[in-house]
C-alpha cells in the first residue's frame, strides 16, 4: 500500500510539470479563434453597469468561473491549493479540488484540505472522483468525501484515453453507467460529470440528461491533452508511448461539445472548459449557452508563482469578459447569446 501511495504522489508531481509543457497542449486544435462575436460600435450602456452574475446549481452566483480540478495528494499541492483558495476567497470564484481518490483508502489524506477549509470557509469547493473509482466505491464513502470537504457538489471525471495511456491506468469502466445512475439517485449532493480534455458526443450527453445529472462540464479538445501527458510518462513503454502519439489529436473540441449539449435543450447545466485561456474565450462559451466556465492551466501557472499572480489572472479574465460584453452591447451574460456570429 505504501508503494501505491508513493507512486500516486510521483504521478501527481509529474502531472504538474508535464501539464505546463507546450507539447502537451492541443492548442493547434483550439476552436476559439474560429468563432467570433458580433462587434457593436455603439454600445448603449455604461461599462460599470455590466453584470457577470450567473446561475450555478440553481443558485445565483456573483462570478461565473471555476478553477478546474488540478492537483492534490503530494508535497507541492498544499502551497498551490492554498494560493488558489486564497484567491478564490477574495474574488468569489469557485474551485474544484484535486483527486480525492487517495482519501478512500488513506484517512490521513483528508487532512490535506482541513487547514485550507479552516482558513477559507466561504470558498465554494467541488469534490473530485474518477469514474473508474465510482464503480466499486460505496455511495456512503463518496458522500463522506463530499461532507468532509464541505463541498457544493461532486465532480465525476471521465478520462478513458488518459487511463489507456497511463502506465498505472485503470481501464475497467464496465458498469460505469449503472454506478452513475445509482449515484445520482441516492446521493444527497448534486452530481456533475466532467471530461478531461476530450469532450462529449451528443449521444453521451443525451444519456446523461436522462439519468438526471445536475451539470456537465464538457472539457473538450483545445487545451491540456492528458493523452499526450501520459505518453511522456510512458516513455519506457513503447506501446503506450506510440499509442499516445497516434491519439495526440483525439477528442471533440470544446465549442462542438457545447453545441452538442445545447442541441438537446437539456435539464442539466452546461459548463465549459478545455482550452479556455482568457475572458474572450469565456465570452464565446457564454454566447453558446454555458453558465459556468472553467480554467486550469492559466491558474496553475499563476499559482506556482504567488497568490498575487492568481488574483491578477482572475481580475484580467473578468475584465476581458466585461470588455467583450461592452463591445457587443451585452449588459448581462444572457445578452451574449444574441451576439454569436452565424
Curated annotation (Swiss-Prot):
CDD domains: IDI-2_FMN. Gene3D superfamilies: Aldolase class I (3.20.20.70). Its cofactor is FMN; NADPH; Mg(2+). The keyword Metal-binding applies. GO terms for cellular component: cytoplasm. Homooctamer. Dimer of tetramers. This is Isopentenyl-diphosphate delta-isomerase. The lineage of its organism: Bacteria, Pseudomonadati, Pseudomonadota, Gammaproteobacteria, Legionellales. The gene is fni.
